[in-house]
Amino acid sequence: MEVQSLTITTNYPPKPASPNPQDIRDTIRSNKTNENLWIQRKDVDTTLRSALEHLKACCIVLNLSAKCDERLNVAVSHGTTEKYQLMSRTGSSDNLKAAVTLLDDNVIQAEVTVKYPKAGGGYYRAVAQPDVQWKLQQLQDLGNHISRVTITLCDLQHEVNLLKGDGERDAFTLATGARILEELKLTMNEISLARNSIMLPRKRSLLELCYFPPTRKFVPPLPQDQLISFYISCCRLVCASYQMVPKTVHPQGLSVFMAESQLPHLDDVIKHLNTVMAILQKLINYLSATMS
């Protein structure tokens, strides 16, 4: 019996052409550009509106109606005096106690009771009602930074509205996206400075305190070996007493007592600033990721 061979012929489809790397790059670039333009059209204005609402709240709390951008429509207001009792953080030390009355960023009155062995009764007590301007520079810086941010973002919002055109045709390009991104980064830096102004302590040197005019306004006068300082740290008003002592008593020749009080309105400001930074950073990330 004859065996017949069986031949199977298979027609394979032609090998697909390898994708052109340049075509892939062009497609990716085109997709990024479209996404960037979409973000400019849909996200930027919404984000700016939200950020400005939080900044407006800060301006109201800090009475910045005269400093912030008028387009926020912050009602004109006048600050009211607030008196704060400053105590040792441990709550048990009576080395230093103070009462400070603030009007916005100004110290109106300061009362101090500090342990001082050379004084009668072992304590030095004094009141200062300075007839010279006594500003807490950190609070003033906070207001200035926030005010500058409101102006920058209001200007940017106006520019974005102009780019939107009549609604049917807009003028958004990658160049406008780059400019928006640059302004947002500058704004973030300004907000960071605002936060740092009340989170990080900024103390005057002992030499500066010696020549600081309000220091000389205590009645009775401060002893020659005693200095008093007020500053902001972590949203707290801090009073520090510095007394020169023999190095046999303290190696540095300086005895320091501190008392403090939380400033609730600064806690509110920090919360708003943190929110603004979060939403602006999200927009910055989107724009940065879609820049070709």
From Swiss-Prot:
What cellular-component terms does GO give this entry?
A: nuclear envelope; RAVE complex
Pfam family membership, one: Rogdi_lz
The primary site where this protein sits is nucleus
* Superkingdom: Eukaryota
Any idea where this protein resides? Nucleus envelope
Query: What residue spans carry the Polar residues bias annotation?
Result: 1-12
| Disordered: annotated span | 1-25
Arranged from A to Z, the UniProt key words for this protein are:
Nucleus
Q: Which family does it belong to?
A: Belongs to the rogdi family.
What is the protein name for this chain? Protein rogdi homolog
Which species does the entry assign this protein to? Answer: Caenorhabditis elegans
